């Protein structure tokens, strides 16, 4: 399995629109055969900080997700919502490396 942990700092006033776009994308994403989890959380301490958690069966399924139309739409809708001065983080964890062999 592949786990993605993503922290995004949003421009003030953009978090709600980002979450709405994410939820639209999620409707199709969770139907992808390789998707195990696709969730978003908002910080209770700073409403401009979002945490995205994705779990995929393997690297190949994650790569397929990257080419989907619904993800491309989400990316286009949200491309200017991130705070350019905000600190974000991206982490990819291989939970069971043997499962990622093609």
Specify the residue positions occupied by each region the protein language model found:
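Short, well-ordered beta-strand segments in beta-rich or mixed alpha/beta enzyme
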Residues: 2-8, 39-66
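Intrinsically disordered, low-complexity segments enriched in polar/charged residues with Gly/Pro
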Residues: 15-16, 26-29, 40-42
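Glycine-rich beta-strand-turn "strand-cap" elements at beta-sheet edges
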Residues: 39-48, 76-102
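Short, surface-exposed ligand-recognition loops at beta-strand->loop->(often short) alpha-helix junctions
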Residues: 9-18
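An amphipathic, aromatic/His-enriched active-site/gating alpha helix that lines ligand/cofactor pockets
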Residues: 24-37, 55-90
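Short, flexible segments with low predicted structural confidence
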Residues: 1-2, 16-17, 33-35
